[in-house]
Amino acid sequence: MSEYFKDFQLTYNFLLSYISSETNLKRDKNMSQVSGASSSLLDAIFLSEKRKNLLLLLKEGPKSSDELKNAFDFPWKSMIPQIKKLIDLDLVIQTDGVYSLSEMGTVIATNMQFLLNTLQIYDENRDFWSEHDLSSIPFNLLTRIGELGQCRVLKPDLSHIFKVQEDIIKCMLASSRIMVLVSAIHPAYHLACLEFIEKKIDVTIILTESVFEGIKAECLPESDTVFSDISVLKLDLPEYKKEVQFFLDCENSHFFVSGGEKKPMMLIVTDKIFALSLLDKHGRVDRNYIVSFEPGALKWGEELFEYYKKNSRPINSL
């Protein structure tokens, strides 16, 4: 079971705690009574799609009866018992024909939305989250993956193994700022960096210690090879070294090195796109990316990037 499902249980227990408080159960009642009453209230909310949707709608703000009628695609008569049930549970308040959440109703609806968002993210991309090593993501951010919103997993087939990176790079070129964490180097990244810098895009790159040491080794005087296993760059060594130093000296590029803790294979965050690639649970490289364009995902991704940047050191030369 993934680590963040432990937080689902914490969220569930948190919800139970609030419900127990709201129903004014006496402290001297035994635990079975508390659990039974709480579970009954959970059933009242989650086993009714109408009541659940009503709570989520009222979370947006008070609504008149006419607004409620227009919001749902079923007869108003069928909504009356659902509203009455929520009023009886002290989750909804009716004042002069206007319905709103009580204080505890707001608390419960907020936590319910949080849980539903998290479950949706997991359910829609279950293979990605269950088959990859999530330990490189700090737990406080892992518990907030519901903020990623609408995501999709990009899976390159063997005949177009580099197409995913190409598609992501095209989106990056349309951005005004770029943040990248790199745990494995590839010649395509070198070429992409040149394009970013030429387009005056502000670029911040975090390299893992091993990647940085690999680049330094290639630039040693006695080195006679650059990316010896792939000849994409077609650069001689002096030219390659010159371009590496150009990257480091450029005003709109900022480089950092991060050692120690485990990192994602690749993290890309811009003002347009969020993309994340992780090792699988066996420590193997996986070329799949989870991608989102939603504002919440961009913010979440930037927080993850800043987490690694905080524990990194700037570099200006090899």
Regions found by a protein language model. Name each.
Residues G61, S183-P187, E261:
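Short beta->alpha connector loops
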Residues L116-S176:
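Amphipathic alpha-helical dimerization/coiled-coil segments
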Residues I168-Y240:
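Primarily the HKD phosphodiesterase
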